[in-house]
């Protein structure tokens, strides 16, 4: 009979789907896999593996369904992992879990296990709602930041849902909560989002572990005067583990502003020009969406004349690219929305 330590080591090497099947082997295996110790250890090892790309497609003019697909590199793509109808808010994907709104309720889903849970309702009748998902890598906790208010000119209130056990809500007692106005991003336990203030648009940081706000981050002058995050001309991205602002000047020209020092609020700028020689001539660009985790590879979405979607990986140093066909997945036209999460890792979180 093998020792428990050796069994744990064997189980840690399994992908999530085979690991989930091991729950049915015997009571001992199920106890080990469901233990907080094993889940934390599995998560810490998963973070060191090569991330996947998770992308979501919404077809605006047909069923308004979000379809989620996961992919490894360089060959993609697996079949859809889950879908959600009539979602009025764009989904979020953090550390292997997806948060999406369906029928005015929040759901958290694990694509690797194909299981999900309904987040207990908080302020269900509030007219204005906004949420972000975050992950605390120190305590291995997933949290949802939920902003709500009844009237347009009213201040937002903020509640935080912690996904642990039965789940719990906590009201954040802060005056003048920064009003969310852009999509957010979670990097190393900090949720960043854009907020309108008396001094214009600023970046807000919320520390997931302590559930406290940090100081505002000023957007670089050269970016704030030209680009508008509210209308999608720029987006927050993870560039080699740092917060960055990817600002579109056109479909082929971008400015990448990288936050080098959050304390000193020092930004660096890189200008990106995508030339036609980098792509097949029969592809129509939809736009850049982010970077492959830990690299200089820019990911650009595109479609061919049959509206089949491609991901194009552009090596900015070598000035070359590789195109990946997504198995015939189609968008209806250029207005179909494609979201890409470039640092997806499988989670053993059993929902």
Swiss-Prot record:
SMART domains hit by this protein: FBOX
Pfam families attached to this UniProt entry: F-box, FBA_3
InterPro entries linked to this entry: F-box-assoc_dom_typ3 (IPR013187), F-box-assoc_interact_dom (IPR017451), F-box-like_dom_sf (IPR036047), F-box_dom (IPR001810)
Entry coiled-coil feature ranges: none
Domain of life: Eukaryota
Residue stretches making up the F-box domain: 1-41
Entry-linked PANTHER family: BNAA05G37150D PROTEIN-RELATED, F-BOX ASSOCIATED UBIQUITINATION EFFECTOR FAMILY PROTEIN-RELATED
The protein, known as: Putative F-box protein At5g52610
Lineage: Eukaryota, Viridiplantae, Streptophyta, Embryophyta, Tracheophyta
């Amino acid at each position: 009979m093998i020792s428990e330590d050796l069994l744990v080591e064997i189980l840690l090497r399994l992908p999530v789907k085979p690991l989930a099947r091991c729950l049915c082997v015997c009571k001992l295996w199920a106890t080990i896999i469901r233990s907080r110790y094993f889940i934390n250890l599995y998560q810490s090892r998963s973070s060191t593996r090569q991330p996947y790309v998770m992308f979501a497609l919404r077809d605006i003019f047909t069923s308004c369904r979000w379809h989620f697909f996961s992919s490894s590199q360089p060959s993609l793509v697996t079949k859809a992992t889950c879908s959600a109808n009539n979602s009025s808010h764009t989904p979020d994907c953090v550390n292997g879990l997806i948060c999406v709104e369906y029928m005015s309720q929040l759901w958290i889903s694990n694509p690797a296990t194909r299981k999900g849970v309904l987040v207990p309702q908080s302020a269900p009748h509030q007219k204005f709602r906004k949420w972000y998902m975050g992950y605390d890598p120190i305590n291995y906790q997933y949290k949802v930041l939920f902003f709500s208010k009844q009237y347009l000119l009213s201040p937002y209130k903020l509640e935080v849902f912690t996904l642990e056990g039965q789940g719990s809500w906590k009201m954040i007692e802060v005056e003048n909560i920064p009003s969310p106005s852009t999509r957010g991003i979670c990097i190393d336990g900090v949720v960043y989002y854009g907020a309108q203030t008396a001094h214009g648009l600023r970046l807000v940081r919320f520390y997931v572990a302590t559930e406290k706000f940090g100081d505002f981050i000023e957007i670089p002058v050269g970016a704030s005067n030209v680009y508008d995050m509210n209308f999608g001309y720029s987006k927050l991205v993870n560039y080699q583990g740092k917060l960055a602002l990817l600002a579109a000047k056109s479909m082929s020209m971008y400015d990448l502003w990288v936050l080098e020092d959050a304390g000193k609020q020092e930004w660096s700028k890189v200008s990106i020009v995508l030339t036609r020689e980098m792509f097949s001539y029969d592809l129509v660009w939809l736009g850049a969406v982010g970077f492959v985790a830990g690299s200089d590879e820019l990911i650009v979405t595109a479609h061919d004349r049959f509206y089949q979607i491609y991901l194009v990986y552009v090596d900015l140093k070598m000035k070359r690219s590789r195109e990946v066909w997504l198995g015939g997945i189609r968008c209806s036209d250029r207005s179909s929305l494609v979201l890409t999460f470039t640092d997806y890792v499988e989670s053993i979180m059993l929902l």
